[in-house]
Curated annotation (Swiss-Prot):
Protein name: Malate dehydrogenase
Keywords of this entry: NAD, Oxidoreductase, Phosphoprotein, Tricarboxylic acid cycle
A Pfam family reported for this protein in Swiss-Prot or TrEMBL: Ldh_1_N
EC numbers on record: 1.1.1.37
NCBIfam families: MalateDH_bact (TIGR01763), PRK06223.1 (NF004863)
HAMAP family: Malate_dehydrog_3 (MF_00487)
Gene source species: Bacillus pumilus (strain SAFR-032)
PANTHER family cross-referenced by the UniProt entry: L-2-HYDROXYCARBOXYLATE DEHYDROGENASE (NAD(P)(+)), L-LACTATE DEHYDROGENASE
Positions with a binding annotation for substrate: R87, R93, N125, R156
GO biological process: lactate metabolic process; tricarboxylic acid cycle
Length: 312
């Protein structure tokens, strides 16, 4: 019997959603359904058709459709949520909470109605709280609802380190813990260039500057763009997670996972090292933290909890 083609639905056809859809199709991970609200159905269909017409040129075989009808998403293996209002200059992530929570709850009801077996990956900001809202609304096990921020934050950290050392980014590894915000915790002790600890290659003050730039990475792009926020790197980070799930790769990657006692926290979604595979979240990896790292993580958790207080 022939293998059934995989199906990924991307909710939200803005810059991030559309880029996620295109990269997913380009890598031939699955057929893609791009979804947006009825008022934007034609532009969504137009983007999907434009991507599809790129397939003969790029040489990929994946069907891409645009729609506002959730029935078209039925039977999805993975659903990615990028829908929501965007952050504007000067706007804190917390300002987004109430509006985006309503969007998350409404979208989630449609997802579980048509794809009850799907694994859901959330990107919408503030992502720790929005992933929690999706989890609560969905009724799915925690393994099937995960958020994306750590891959993006780690990618930014790796980029800045590679620039500092004038090395290939391929040789730089790192890990970022905590919430997706100014209190994220880049774990410098677990960061390497070609297997060599960063602390032996870069002076402390330069590492501190890189950590600070990583924390402000999203805001830096928001300010440069003047209108809108980052989308290429967030989309690429999402697709790395989608690939790990669809191919059951069991990749070690930082994701936003629901904690039930891990790291000493309970009932909260937080960025931690995890193993991602065919079941979604396969395992949470607990690292030994120094006192300073622990206190930074506590601060990060408090920030996430403060955002979660706004949730209904």
């Amino acid at each position: 019997m022939a293998n059934k083609r995989k199906k990924v639905s991307v909710i939200g056809a803005g810059f991030t959603g559309a880029t996620t859809a295109f990269l997913t199709a380009q890598k031939e991970l699955a057929d893609v359904v791009l979804v947006d609200i009825p008022q934007l159905e034609n532009p969504t269909k137009g983007k999907a058709l434009d991507m599809l017409e790129a397939s003969p040129v790029q040489g990929f075989d994946a069907n891409i459709t645009g729609t506002s009808n959730y029935e078209d998403t039925a039977g999805s293996d993975v659903v990615v949520i990028t829908a929501g209002i965007a952050r504007k200059p000067g706007m804190s992530r917390d300002d987004l909470v109430s509006t985006n929570e309503k969007i998350m709850r409404s979208v989630t009801r449609e997802i579980v109605k048509y794809s009850p077996e799907a694994i859901i990956v959330v990107l919408t900001n503030p992502v720790d709280a929005m992933t929690y809202a999706v989890y609560k609304e969905s009724g799915l096990p925690k393994e099937k609802v995960i958020g994306q921020s750590g891959i993006l934050d780690t990618a930014r950290f790796r980029t800045f380190v590679a620039q500092e050392l004038n090395l290939s980014v391929k040789d730089v590894t790192g890990f970022v813990l905590g919430g997706h915000g100014d209190d994220m915790v880049p774990l410098v002790r677990y960061s390497y260039a070609g297997g060599i600890p960063l602390e032996t290659l870069i002076p402390k003050e330069r590492i501190d500057a890189i950590v600070e730039r990583t924390r402000k990475g999203g805001g830096e792009i928001v300010n440069l763009l003047g209108n809108g926020s980052a989308y290429y790197a967030p989309a690429a980070s999402l697709v790395e997670m989608v690939e790990a799930i669809l191919k059951d790769q069991r990749r070690v990657m930082p994701t936003i996972a629901y904690l039930e006692g891990e790291y000493g926290y309970e009932g909260i979604y937080l960025g931690v090292p995890t193993i991602v595979g065919g079941n979604g979240l396969e395992q949470i990896i607990e690292l030994e933290l120094t006192e300073e790292e622990r206190s930074q993580l506590d601060r990060s958790v408090e920030s996430v909890k403060n955002v979660m207080k706004v949730l209904s």
